[in-house]
Amino acid sequence: MCVKFTDAEIAYIKESVENYSSEFDIYDDEQELKLKIYEQIMLKIKSEYKDTYLFRLIN
């Protein structure tokens, strides 16, 4: 399934992920895992989807 995001939606996702991931206090493995997931989301947005804004959702 593919979902196309607008520029405004991409900006919102980036801001949300950056804000949320900066609030993590690493105190257990679960929090560390969440931080890594959000960092991966940011990397994916910055690299693979920078020009096309096409996201593939894999379940």
Swiss-Prot record:
Q: Which UniProt keywords apply?
A: DNA recombination, DNA-binding, Viral genome excision
Name its GO BP terms in alphabetical order.
DNA recombination; provirus excision
What GO molecular functions are on record for this protein? DNA binding
Answer whether the UniProt record assigns the keyword DNA-binding to this protein.
yes
Report the superkingdom from the record. Viruses
Q: What does this protein do?
A: Excisionase and integrase are necessary for the excision of prophage from the host genome by site-specific recombination at the att site.
Q: What is this protein's name?
A: Excisionase
Q: Which taxonomic lineage does the organism of this UniProt entry have?
A: Viruses, Duplodnaviria, Heunggongvirae, Uroviricota, Caudoviricetes
Gene label: xis
